[in-house]
Amino acid sequence: MGSAAVLVANRGEIAVRVLRAAQEAGLRTVAVYADGDDAHVGLADEAVPLAGGYLDAGALIEAALRTGCGCLHPGYGFLSEDADFAGRCAEAGVRFVGPSAKTLRLLGDKVRARELAARAGVPVLDGASGLAEARALLAGGPLMVKAVGGGGGRGMRVVRSAGELAEAWERCRSEARQAFARDEVYAERLLEGARHIEVQIVGDTTGAVTHLWDRDCSAQRRHQKLIEIAPAPELPDSLREKVLDSALRLARAAGVTSLTTVEFLLHGGEFRFIEANPRLQVEHTVTEEVTGVDLVAVQLRLAAGDTLADVGLAGPPPAPRGVAVQARVNAEVTAGDGSVLPQSGRITRFDVPTGPGIRVDTALRAGREVGTRYDALLAKVIAHAPHGGVEAACARARRALAEFAVDGVRTGIPLLREVLDRPRFWAHTGVVAEHVRATEPGAPTWQDGSVTAPMSGTVVSVDVALGEPVRAGQQVLVIEAMKMEHVVRAPASGVVRRLHARVGGTVTAGALLAELDEVAGADPSEPEDARADLDAVRADLAETERRHGFTLDANRPEAVAKRHALGRRTARENIDDLCDKDSFTEFGALAIAAQRRRAGPWTS
């Protein structure tokens, strides 16, 4: 691998995971760390401080060169999918452990990846790359606005009405810029009630590509994965083969030379590609447990020039052995309205579970501070059951979480245990939200004109001024926590009397941000969104227009062809010739004959 040393350009549990794998491979290891974030550095042979943080590409490359590292492992998040960073590493003579810059430009850009998938014959969702296109697409139903780069649920918002689109677009851009150093976003059709399935791909520089089966990631809240399962349960063999084949076709088209995950949404017997992540995934652990393949070690060897044959993956993929489940233990709690509240504090107790089939990936220990600057992930608990199927693996994971004792900060362990106890929690991506709504108390009510912080974090914008009238639901300010932006809205209509927050300031959960004086005669329950958007297309109108489209000749090619074959014209062709443009008004295009007595009532 050139110089037998690797710089790990990340933090937390993934830095620990890569450092250990590199040391087992006989490599000298170098860690980097930001101020106050050095929990992982004890495992490295050498550590370099970062003044500019983990997105400072120049500092990372300079640190690799200064410490004699021939390669750099980006982990996940931060710069792991940044093609320019990979290119700069290559120019400096530092091997980037991951796909080539060319592949990263293809797959690290979700819009380009969608286009590549479509060309490769992989089914995709309808999408829009610009705000104007997104407005048009929204007329046909709800959308998901997503960051073009990165992942982890950051830079994602569901949009159901035209009034929500512009704000969601800007929030996604801002989150993406903070987390991934790029702010492009796009939109695609929201497919609700679907499962989230992904395929682990491995490729080498000879063009050989294979898969290591699939994972189910449907247990999510706010588009962030909570629990993953390998292999995906209740997936028919015929459908699994189609999904695996589609993932391989895309990987070959992209020229994958390392690890990549190809992600799909499944609904009924159909599936659609949503994105490809050309990097190590947080949930790589469950694939390792059921296949026996050390994915980080494979990454390092492929970066050194080894082939799939060299790492023992040239033949058929190893058959999955049992089932593995991963639960992400985060420093956060989830409110009944679905909002996620990051937690911070000093960990006073951190007792991880042990026992057969239990693995815990973490960088933390008692005495460490947990803040809101980075991801909320404290640890990953992985349970593997060689026998007994997904039920046995889930039961083992529940027991492990019951033994996991964390004091000093609140965690999501109670929610994880509840979800794992729920039958078929992988049925679709909305199951966790349904569970939270049914079991958790709602958001706090407004009292005394106070606008308070729902979580600890940093104020990134203040959007009102003293004396300004605001309406219920209007954006007051934005708090950034764990690289996610959270809009704080006015709980009722009023006038801003005091502002206690400033841009760049840090606030704690429950802190007073602003005070409002209620406006006499105002309806405090009427949200800002209740005001009519004159440009908005109502969902029922959009659906009616869509159905009307079925009656047009352009959407009836077989009927038109049949009419022409008889030497005749369609009624609409006659109308077009007889009437001036836009002068013909049609009523009842969707009316049908009254045939209830003959055909009986509809049953669908």
Regions found by a protein language model. Give the residues of each.
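Terminal-region recognition feature
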Residues: 528-604
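Short, well-ordered beta-strand elements within core beta-sheets of diverse protein domains
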Residues: 156-158, 189, 235, 377-387, ...
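Short histidine-centered loop motifs in beta-beta connectors
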Residues: 454, 461-469, 498-502
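N-terminal beta-alpha lobe that positions the nucleotide/phosphoryl donor
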Residues: 1-262, 266-281, 569-571, 586, ...
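Short hydrophobic beta/alpha edge segments that flank linear recognition/processing sites
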Residues: 468-488, 508-524
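Short, compositionally biased
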Residues: 489-497, 520-536
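Catalytic cores of soluble metabolic enzymes centered on carboxylation/carboxyl-transfer
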Residues: 247, 285-450, 456, 475, ...
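Generic structural motif
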Residues: 345, 451-459, 490-498
